[in-house]
Amino acid sequence: MKKVLLIFALLFSLDRLTKYLVVKFLPLGSEIRLIGEFVKITHVRNPHSLWSISLGRNFPYIILGVVAIVFLIALILDSIKSKNILNANLFAVILAGVAGNIADRVHFREVIDFIDIGLSPTLRWPVFNVADSCISIGLAIYFIMVLKEYFAKRSQ
């Protein structure tokens, strides 16, 4: 349980710290090029969901986030109970991301995004943040594990 809490605390804190630094030192709409056009820090605000996908102007993002947090905590506790520590750790990574973006929505009514990756000014991935990365990476690894287990059972 301590490792799960540590993973959550470190990633949540990293998300909050990076967003704080962006808000404090980089005016909205400004950018800092780290590796030419490929990697930039760009301060944008996102009223939508992951990767700027819109679910509608009045979509209850905070309510959905709270439901996700409760669900993830239940998954973590169940994983710990069944001694599936890898799943518990993955759910803690996802939880840190959800909690980080919900904290933004509560405080700013939108999410602070700043990681800007692309090949040119017109060929870019949607700007994202540490929380988005936690959600995406955690879910990707979890789904790969589920698929691997499914195909292993199917081949027997």
Where are the model-predicted features located?
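Alpha-helical transmembrane bundles and membrane-interface segments of multipass inner-membrane proteins
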Residues: 1-156
